């Protein structure tokens, strides 16, 4: 599946300020004939009885059938993924670049096996992740590959794409260039997009946290489980999401620093930090940030 085969929708907040095969054992009809000889032989050789043998065989067959049915009960499932900005409208001061709000930019997603393919804690961010974390666009800086490009064809990535305004209808009051490359969602806004996945596959995504120099929201290293013992997961999965520092620019005071989206004059204008991706909780920059579950809510709805 490519990004062009995946439906994405943007749900703007009403009144929100937006500055930006069935498988199983069927049997073969041997229950009625020829079984006496097998049972008698079993009795002679093993000292068992017809009832015990039949029961054991039936129980084992039923167990096998149940396991087969359970493992094959769900094939590919379509999920609607909703990423909602649940932050307060005045977390930062009204005189900050976002008017006190926290914004979440459009981003890139991947359905994958194995670990989250968008980043690795303790390693340098990719070129595409740097662009997203510093300025918001999942399509990258001009002339450089974006995160969407990096995910396309990557090992263990089953499908990938971007949830961007190019495929949506944005709020008419939303300034389209609030974050270079793509507008963000303000408190109360949400993105929705559909993915298709099979058991053992997981979901990861990344969106920039605004205002910041290079912070982003993404699931942890494992990604978000889409199935629980073969059953599609439904409901709130925000507990798998973390706030990370890309390590590409030094952090400034949120909403005040001149090298941050949306205040910066151009993307990638801040100094290079040369660091590695870390959870924000491990970065002692002295600034205040909201808890993840007070910033974003991520839900899954299987179709």
Task: Give the location of each predicted region.
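Terminal disorder- and signal-encoded targeting elements
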Residues: 1-80, 84-91, 95-176, 180, ...
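Short proline/glycine- and polar residue-rich coil/turn motifs
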Residues: 184-185
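Short strand-edge motifs at loop-to-beta-strand transitions and within beta-strands
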Residues: 189-193
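A short, structured loop/turn motif at beta-sheet edges
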Residues: 196-201, 227-231
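Short, surface-exposed ligand- or partner-binding patches at beta-edge/loop junctions that are enriched
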Residues: 198-212
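Extracytoplasmic/secretory-pathway segments with low complexity and glycosylation-like composition
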Residues: 210, 219-232
């Amino acid at each position: 599946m490519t990004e062009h085969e995946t439906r994405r929708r943007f749900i703007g907040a009403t009144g929100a300020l937006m500055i930006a095969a069935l498988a199983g054992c069927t049997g073969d009809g041997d229950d009625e004939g020829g079984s006496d000889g097998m049972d008698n032989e079993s009795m002679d050789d093993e000292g068992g009885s017809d009832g015990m043998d039949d029961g054991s065989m039936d129980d084992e067959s039923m167990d096998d059938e149940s396991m087969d049915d359970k493992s094959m009960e769900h094939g590919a499932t379509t999920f609607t993924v909703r990423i909602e900005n649940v932050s307060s409208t005045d977390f930062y001061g009204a005189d900050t670049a976002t008017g006190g709000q926290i914004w979440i930019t459009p981003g890139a997603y991947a359905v994958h096996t194995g670990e989250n393919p968008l980043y690795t804690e303790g390693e340098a961010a990719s070129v595409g992740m740097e662009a997203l974390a510093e300025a918001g666009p999942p399509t990258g800086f001009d002339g450089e590959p974006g995160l969407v490009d990096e995910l396309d064809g990557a090992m263990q990535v089953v499908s990938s794409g971007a949830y961007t305004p190019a495929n949506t209808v944005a709020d008419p009051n939303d300034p389209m260039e609030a974050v270079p490359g793509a507008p963000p969602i303000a408190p109360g806004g949400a993105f929705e997009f559909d993915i298709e996945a099979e058991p053992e596959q997981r979901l990861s995504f990344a969106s920039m946290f605004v205002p910041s120099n290079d912070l982003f929201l993404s699931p942890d290293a494992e990604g978000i489980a889409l199935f629980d013992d073969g059953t599609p997961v439904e409901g709130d999965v925000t507990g798998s999401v973390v706030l990370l520092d890309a390590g590409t620019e030094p952090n400034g005071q949120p909403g005040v620093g001149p090298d941050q989206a949306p205040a910066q004059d151009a993307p990638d204008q801040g100094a290079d930090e040369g660091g590695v991706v870390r959870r924000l909780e491990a970065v002692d920059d002295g600034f205040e940030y909201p808890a993840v579950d007070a910033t974003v809510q991520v839900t899954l709805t299987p179709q």
